[in-house]
């Protein structure tokens, strides 16, 4: 499916860039469809990063400076303006909003235009503002929040990203579809153990 990734570059969010680029690069490698990257403060700056590597994204964004206010809603408003239909949305931000459009109203307009509600994942980095996004919309939108430290590494981002799905209950369905082991399979030692035992004896 198509992914929309928003990275907060408002004044207090200079540390959102690294996890945001790691996330965008991971999705760009993994998904078969498009990845649209939107840097945002009170305005959106949009790039198609489908197929890009982390090194390419770092080079592409080295002149971006964290400054300005915050409008998380402008991410989905920009996607709608570009006629980009996202199957899922990932945001890297502290969840604070100070400028219109607010995320809730922009998301509902975007969803109505597409005829579907894409799941929203917030990678919440530390910031100066309270996490208004979770407080306002956590119970009303298909929404999940991942608290993220300032210094998260690639392995940490990938571990979180691997749980994201383009359907609201995609991970639950994947777990339910996984065949259960029989008692014999569960108690059977791994093949490598049997090889090591045979060599030892």
What are these model-predicted stretches?
Residues 1-201:
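Acidic, glycine-rich A-domain
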């Amino acid at each position: 499916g198509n992914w929309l990734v928003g990275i907060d570059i408002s004044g207090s969010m200079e540390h959102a860039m690294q996890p945001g680029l790691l996330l965008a690069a991971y999705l760009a490698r993994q998904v078969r469809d498009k990845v649209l990257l939107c840097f945002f403060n009170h305005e959106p700056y949009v790039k198609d990063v489908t197929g890009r590597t982390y090194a390419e994204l770092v080079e592409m964004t080295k002149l971006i400076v964290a400054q300005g206010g915050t409008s998380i809603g402008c991410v989905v408003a920009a996607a709608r303006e570009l006629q980009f239909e996202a199957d899922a949305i990932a945001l890297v931000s502290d969840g604070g909003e100070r400028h219109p459009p607010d995320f809730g109203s922009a998301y509902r307009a975007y969803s109505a235009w597409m005829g579907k509600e894409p799941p929203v994942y917030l990678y919440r980095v530390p910031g100066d503002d309270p996490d208004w996004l979770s407080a306002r919309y956590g119970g009303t939108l298909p929404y999940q929040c991942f608290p993220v430290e300032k210094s998260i590494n690639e392995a940490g981002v990938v571990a979180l990203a691997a749980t994201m799905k383009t359907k609201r209950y995609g991970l639950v369905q994947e777990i339910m579809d996984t065949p259960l082991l029989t008692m014999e399979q569960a108690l059977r030692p791994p093949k490598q153990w049997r090889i090591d035992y045979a060599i030892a004896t």
